[in-house]
């Protein structure tokens, strides 16, 4: 064994490690739990080794007890090398690195005035000479990391830690410029771009598909990263299973393998478990260089240490180069690393061995407090409020980042590191590790993959894996899938009933065209929903792209593969019902062509709308573009505007229109060879003309047909009326599929080369003129002075009136498949003024769940037990008077930081407090949170990369609660994701709140010793939601530690962190174990009995000490409903103003559609065909209104999520939000409607037949109709739980709107069932009646020669009047006049005499115009009531 030990030490030295730097780490002890898994691996190794040399794989024949995780990795690496593999030893060397970013004033918050100022600035000479503002994110940084080494990067927010990691990971696209020399094992950074998968960056936020399980998430990643050079006899499946089980065991998520991941809106893994999944997924990539950015966020201290040890072992054994940035690192984690790089304001102020860093800064004159961790000390020296200067060094220590950098570059350690870096680079030059690296990368590639590919697996393998994952995503949403196909079935029956069993006469001729076009439109509307799906999962795609898991184009191919079976089913369900109920030709071949064409059209439309999504940065831009295209495609399909009526400036569009080719193909399929008759409708008609002798003198009212032809073929109608060429059916079907392929290729290219995500990089934008100077020395001094002043004045501004809050026998049960699960088990405790209680436990112990229960945030499950405030039952105002800092940072992105804080203060502080005082307190909180310089910065979103960072969002979350001056404060991991200094400020601030009289409880994962000392009491939970300890912490934690020492735990040393000590003692962490059943021990302890007695005493004390309120009953909300409504409206109006994509998008859409429709129906005349064109003009305007529904739904759904968060904290009620989000749209709707009106009304020539009253009426009813459409979309969105469900439901509802409007099917032709109620309940019907009668009532029809139906008459009648007198006595519309045909006397019939005749055939009257306006307004009001109702019903989120 001694020989083995010596060999082990020798291996460590070869790797370049000095284990003496961290003697307290016991790898053997930390890896006991891997024994069972290791035994399995050992057996596999022995079986393989039996064929070769068994002793070489077992590291000298260690016993089973010695075979730990380290040995597993060592054996795996050894086996790999002996089978011809190569080592990937890729260190990183950086010299004189300067990274330049955009200055804070380079861009300002965009709003509706931005386009105007941009246009004005374009003509200013200064615009062309002004230089873009920039600043140095990193300045002249020189550092390196050898293969197998670990470097810890420390720094406060804004120091440049994340930027350094991104540059090392070769992700530099977000920066203005990157100067300096970066080499990877001797390979320049430019050349290393081809090995993207070998240097990865893992950002601090977690990006996953929330509906996938842990198993599905990791199995997919493994399928994409399964190497080609596996061990002999090792299949792809066995490799994946081995690595999957290993990683789940390493990070303690074995039991969560089949749990969905979840996110802030979907229940799933806890925050800590989700973080472990992020780490695990990154490790699957098997990169040579890994950069971890705050990867311990959300992990408890024990789990964070386990994670650090795991990457230590992998770095040692697999020669991984590891660079990590931790905001809060304990000494245990710190000592795992080899070197540390300390940054401040973009400058390197120390780089060298971890063991020398503390001494270096102490030599500069700084002192370290007892029990303060080294990482906290290293970052704290840069903060004037935290650093301690030794006596005798006053005025001699560095003050600014430039001073620290100068001191560093004058030090001996700096010169030593430069020398070591030079020697390392010389070693690289001699050994040329890149040769083995390049060969290994080639060998890892799949045999079916290109050798120079950046990806491990082939394109086909990627597509197969993505296809399976996409199927899982679809099938995991069973409710959405069910509702989609239910909607398809309902729509099929609705369409079929309207066009049921169409006759083979001339009336059936026209309705067949409408039915076929409706079938094409139906599939298009369903496809629109796919566009919004392209915006979901963009961050996941960006992450996977950076990991080189798959080509983005492979994702689209997989989506297309997924589309095919679901589209086939969708079209089959529709076709099997619609085709035969329509009464189309009962022919199997024709049914197949009908369905096959619809499938192609649906796939092509899906690809087209996805293309808009991929090309556009905003969903609203994409939706507006798609709406314009739908109007264009519908107008030029060949049905609403026949080809002879198309003007040359737009007629070209029919050649690139999917609808045109699909419509022509299905029309040809149905009409070719089919015979129609016009026996009943031939002119003249009536009993007097029924004899066979009159057949030769009657004519079908169909252009181009010969007199006497009462039967005709469908080809004749297609040729003469529609101008569709014969024999083009097959060609048109092929073209439809060609368009599909074309858009698929476009989408592949768009996904490969267009990336609208930021890759985790956030760029701040400020109000105009409010941007601070970046990394400026003077600005730095001013900021330090502000924080110092705020700290000194804290006590003067904090006045709290807290109470005693108790809870007893709290149990929380949720339903799970197969039964129920108890998450909290008889928890009891209290918080009272002046005390600060810590809530601790391992990840998944139930800390967040307990806070949710105590704060009355739970809406699901069963809560049992008693909670009392001041000895009394909780009242209706409890949520308002308590602050709850949640783990997830949910903020409205359209506000600035200061606006968000002021909004909270205005609505949650008592109404008696003046606005001036509220705003003054907001400024104080901004200063204390070190966010004064961010006050005018836009919050933004991480997806777009515009806004504040993850860490700044956490501080804002805390600030939003603090400005409300709550009486009780619950904080769920308030320091998670914050740096040590920010954490210290937060805890110190909270301590001040407690000292001022606020009771509070705070969950905390990784408290340093300094932070932990601020707490008075602790509630420690074990997994299963059971109490381990509740009581005082005591001076220097003696009371707490003595409890555990009394039950057999080793004593806690003076230098040890008590928080880490108790987590270790209770078996927390990934693989933590304890021989003591701590929950049972607590039940038997005398402390529990004391707790029970004190609880009873506190209830009585609270009831006596705190009088019943004298200001009347408790108020749920602080402010009146009117005040809430005013403030909510102002906020929403500001958000709309700052979203030009949304507001101007609707304006541009209205302008384009107005111009397209206006120029399509250019300068309409008085002929009968022009009157039909007037009807279709109005129908297109109606479709524009309907398409606006798609635009407004995402806005309400997204804003509702922010409302739920605000409502939970009782900012405002449901009514102010519901009414405000409707009213805020109205002015923008008026502008949109007016733009459309001006672009189309005069262009189409409608002014020639309209007086001023008719013109005003047209504008007014159109705007009112837009009010209805927008509010209808909002009402539907309010009903739906998510965007997918909304996009599934809305096509079904739109069918009723346009199908029963009286245009697609005349009212007399609508089936009695629908005509009896749906027709009369359809707002579009009243819109069409009002606007059609308004336009046509003054139109006198004078048929053109082409529109006249001319026919001869028997000579015995002498004159046309004699022949048609009987016909005219029947009261037909239109007029008859004498004419000449081929030199013979004839009659010419014009189908309409005036517009009134047309709309009277529909049962409409111009007397109902203003009545119809009133009815539409009633529908608008009804929609508002529906929005209010469903906002009320869904006001509480599911949690």
UniProtKB/Swiss-Prot annotation:
Residues 1-21 are annotated as: Disordered. The keyword Chloroplast does not apply. GO terms for biological process: aggregation involved in sorocarp development; sorocarp morphogenesis. Pfam families: ABC2_membrane, ABC2_membrane_7, ABC_tran, ABC_trans_N, PDR_CDR. Residues 1-17 have a biased composition (Basic and acidic residues). Residues 117-370, 805-1049 form the ABC transporter domain. GO terms for cellular component: membrane. It is found in: Membrane. It is a multi-pass membrane protein. CDD domains: ABCG_PDR_domain1, ABCG_PDR_domain2. Belongs to the ABC transporter superfamily. ABCG family. PDR (TC 3.A.1.205) subfamily. This is ABC transporter G family member 14. It comes from Dictyostelium discoideum (Social amoeba). The gene is abcG14.
């Amino acid at each position: 064994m001694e020989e083995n030990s010596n060999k082990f030490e020798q291996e460590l030295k070869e790797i370049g490690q000095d284990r003496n730097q961290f003697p307290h780490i016991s790898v053997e002890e930390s890896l006991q739990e891997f024994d069972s898994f290791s035994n399995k691996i050992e057996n596999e190794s022995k079986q393989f080794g039996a064929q070769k040399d068994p002793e070489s794989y077992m590291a000298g024949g260690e016993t089973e007890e010695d075979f730990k995780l380290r040995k597993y990795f060592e054996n795996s690496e050894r086996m790999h090398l002996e089978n011809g593999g190569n080592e990937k030893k890729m260190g990183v060397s950086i010299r004189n690195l300067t990274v330049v970013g955009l200055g804070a004033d380079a861009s300002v918050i965009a709003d509706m005035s931005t386009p105007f100022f941009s246009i004005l600035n374009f003509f200013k000479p200064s615009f062309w000479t002004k230089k873009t503002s920039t600043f140095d994110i990193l300045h002249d940084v020189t550092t390196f990391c050898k293969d197998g080494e670990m470097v810890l990067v420390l720094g406060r927010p804004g120091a440049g830690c994340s930027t350094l990691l991104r540059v090392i990971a070769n992700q530099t696209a977000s920066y203005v410029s990157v100067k300096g020399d970066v080499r990877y094992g001797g390979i320049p950074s430019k050349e290393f771009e081809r090995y993207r998968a070998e240097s990865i960056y893992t950002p601090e936020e977690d990006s996953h598909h929330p509906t996938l399980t842990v198993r599905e998430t990791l199995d997919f990643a493994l399928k994409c990263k399964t190497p080609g050079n596996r061990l002999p006899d090792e299949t792809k499946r066995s490799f994946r299973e081995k690595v999957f089980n290993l990683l789940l065991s390493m990070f303690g998520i074995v039991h969560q393998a089949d749990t969905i991941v979840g996110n802030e809106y979907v229940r799933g893994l806890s925050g800590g478990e989700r973080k472990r999944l992020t780490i695990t997924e990154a490790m699957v990539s098997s990169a040579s260089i890994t950069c971890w950015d705050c990867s311990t966020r959300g992990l408890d201290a024990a789990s964070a240490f386990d994670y650090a040890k795991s990457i230590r072992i992998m770095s040692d054994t697999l020669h991984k180069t590891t660079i990590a940035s931790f905001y809060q690192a304990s000494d245990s984690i710190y000592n795992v690393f080899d070197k540390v790089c300390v940054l401040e304001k973009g400058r390197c102020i120390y780089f060298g061995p971890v063991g020398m860093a503390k001494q270096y800064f102490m030599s500069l004159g700084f002192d370290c407090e007892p029990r303060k961790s080294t990482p906290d000390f290293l970052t704290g020296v840069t903060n004037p409020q935290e650093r301690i200067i030794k006596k005798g060094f006053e005025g001699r220590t560095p003050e600014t980042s430039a001073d620290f950098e100068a001191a560093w570059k004058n030090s001996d350690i700096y010169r030593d590191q430069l020398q070591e870096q030079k020697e390392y680079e010389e070693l690289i030059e001699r050994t040329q590790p890149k040769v083995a690296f390049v060969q290994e990368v080639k060998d890892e590639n799949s045999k079916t993959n290109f050798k120079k590919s950046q990806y491990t697996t082939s394109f086909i393998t990627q597509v197969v894996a993505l296809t399976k994952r996409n199927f899982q995503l679809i099938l995991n949403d069973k409710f959405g899938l069910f509702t989609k196909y239910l909607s398809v079935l309902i729509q099929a029956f609705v369409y079929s009933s309207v066009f049921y069993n169409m006759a083979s006469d001339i009336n059936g001729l026209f309705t067949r065209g409408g039915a076929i076009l409706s079938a094409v439109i139906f599939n298009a509307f369903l496809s629109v929903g796919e566009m919004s799906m392209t915006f979901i999962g963009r961050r996941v795609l960006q992450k996977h792209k950076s990991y080189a898991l798959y080509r983005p184009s492979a994702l689209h191919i997989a989506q297309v593969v997924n589309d095919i079976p679901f589209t086939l089913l969708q079209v089959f369900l529709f076709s099997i019902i619609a085709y035969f109920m329509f009464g189309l030709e009962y022919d199997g071949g024709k049914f197949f062509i009908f369905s096959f064409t619809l499938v192609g059209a649906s796939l092509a439309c899906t690809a087209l709308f996805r293309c808009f999504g991929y090309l556009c940065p905003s969903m609203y831009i994409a939706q507006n573009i798609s709406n314009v295209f739908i109007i264009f495609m519908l107008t030029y399909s060949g049905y609403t505007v026949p080809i002879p009526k198309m003007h040359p400036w737009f007629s070209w569009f029919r050649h690139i229109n999917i609808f045109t080719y699909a419509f022509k193909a299905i029309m040809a399929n149905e009409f070719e060879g089919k015979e129609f008759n016009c026996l009943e409708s031939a002119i003249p008609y009536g009993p007097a003309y029924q004899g066979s002798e009159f057949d030769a003198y009657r004519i079908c009212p169909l252009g181009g047909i010969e007199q006497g032809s009462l039967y005709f073929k469908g080809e004749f109608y297609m040729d003469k009326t529609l101008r569709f060429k014969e024999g083009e059916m097959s060609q048109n079907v092929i073209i439809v599929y060609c368009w599909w392929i074309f858009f698929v290729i476009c989408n592949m290219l768009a996904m490969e080369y267009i990336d609208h995500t930021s890759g985790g990089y956030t760029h701040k934008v400020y109000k105009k003129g409010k941007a601070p100077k970046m990394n400026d020395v003077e600005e730095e001094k001013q900021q330090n002075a502000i924080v110092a002043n705020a700290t000194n004045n804290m006590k003067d501004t904090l006045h709290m009136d807290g109470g005693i809050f108790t809870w007893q026998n709290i149990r929380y049960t949720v339903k799970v498949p197969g039964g129920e699960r108890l998450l909290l088990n008889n928890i009891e405790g209290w918080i009272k003024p002046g005390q600060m209680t810590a809530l601790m436990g391992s990840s998944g112990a139930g800390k967040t769940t307990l806070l949710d229960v105590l704060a009355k945030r739970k809406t699901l499950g069963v809560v049992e037990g008693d909670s009392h405030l001041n000895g009394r039952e909780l009242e209706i105002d409890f949520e308002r008077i308590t602050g709850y800092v949640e783990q997830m940072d949910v903020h409205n992105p359209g506000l600035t930081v200061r606006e968000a804080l002021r909004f909270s203060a205005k609505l949650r502080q008592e109404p008696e407090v003046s606005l001036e005082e509220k705003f003054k307190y907001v400024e104080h909180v901004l200063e204390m949170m070190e966010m004064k310089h961010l006050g005018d910065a836009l919050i933004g979103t991480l997806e777009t990369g515009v806004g504040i960072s993850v860490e700044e969002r956490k501080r804002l979350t805390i600030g939003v609660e603090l400005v409300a001056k709550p009486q009780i404060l619950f904080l769920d991991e308030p320091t998670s994701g914050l740096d040590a200094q920010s954490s210290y400020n937060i805890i110190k601030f909270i301590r001040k709140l407690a000292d001022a009289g606020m009771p509070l409880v705070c969950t905390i994962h990784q408290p340093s010793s300094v932070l932990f000392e601020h707490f008075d009491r602790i509630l420690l939970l074990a997994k299963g939601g059971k109490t381990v300890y509740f009581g005082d912490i005591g001076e220097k934690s003696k009371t707490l530690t003595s409890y555990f020492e009394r039950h057999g735990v080793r004593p806690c040393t003076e230098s040890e962190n008590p928080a880490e000590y108790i987590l270790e003692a209770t078996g927390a962490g990934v693989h933590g174990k304890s021989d003591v059943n701590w929950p049972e021990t607590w039940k038997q302890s005398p402390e529990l009995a004391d707790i029970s007695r004190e609880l009873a005493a506190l209830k009585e004390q609270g009831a006596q000490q705190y009088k019943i309120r004298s200001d009347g009953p408790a108020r749920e909300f602080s402010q009146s409903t009117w005040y809430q409504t005013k403030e909510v409206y102002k906020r929403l109006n500001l958000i709309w103003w700052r979203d030009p994509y949304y507001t101007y998008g609707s304006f541009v859409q209205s302008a384009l559609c107005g111009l397209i429709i206006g120029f399509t129906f250019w300068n309409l005349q008085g002929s009968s065909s022009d009157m039909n064109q007037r009807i279709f003009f109005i129908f297109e305007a109606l479709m524009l209104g309907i398409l606006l529904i798609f635009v407004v739904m995402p806005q309400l759904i997204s804003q509702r999520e922010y409302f739920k968060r605000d409502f939970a904290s009782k900012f405002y009620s449901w009514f102010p939000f519901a009414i405000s989000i409707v009213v805020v749209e109205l002015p923008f709707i008026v502008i949109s409607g007016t733009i459309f009106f001006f672009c189309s009304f005069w262009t189409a020539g409608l002014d020639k037949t309209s007086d001023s009253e008719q013109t005003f009426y047209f504008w007014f009813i159109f705007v009112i109709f837009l009010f209805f459409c927008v509010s209808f979309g909002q009402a539907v969105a309010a009903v739906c739980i998510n965007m997918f469900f909304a996009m599934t439901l809305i096509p079904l509802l739109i069918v009723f709107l346009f199908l029963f409007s009286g245009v697609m099917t005349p009212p007399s032709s609508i089936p009695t069932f629908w005509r009896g109620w749906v027709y009369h309940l359809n707002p579009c019907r009243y819109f069409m009646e009002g606007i059609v009668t308004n336009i046509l009532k003054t139109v006198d029809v004078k048929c053109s020669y082409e529109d006249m139906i001319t026919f001869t008459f028997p000579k015995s009648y002498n004159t046309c009047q004699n022949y048609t007198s009987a016909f005219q006595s029947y009261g037909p519309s239109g007029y008859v006049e004498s004419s000449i045909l081929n030199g013979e006397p004839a009659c010419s019939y014009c189908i309409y005499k005036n517009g009134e005749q047309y709309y009277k055939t529909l049962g409409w009257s111009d007397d109902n115009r203003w009545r119809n306006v009133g009815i539409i307004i009633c529908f608008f009001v009804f929609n508002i009531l529906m929005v209010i109702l469903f906002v009320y019903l869904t006001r509480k989120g599911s949690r």
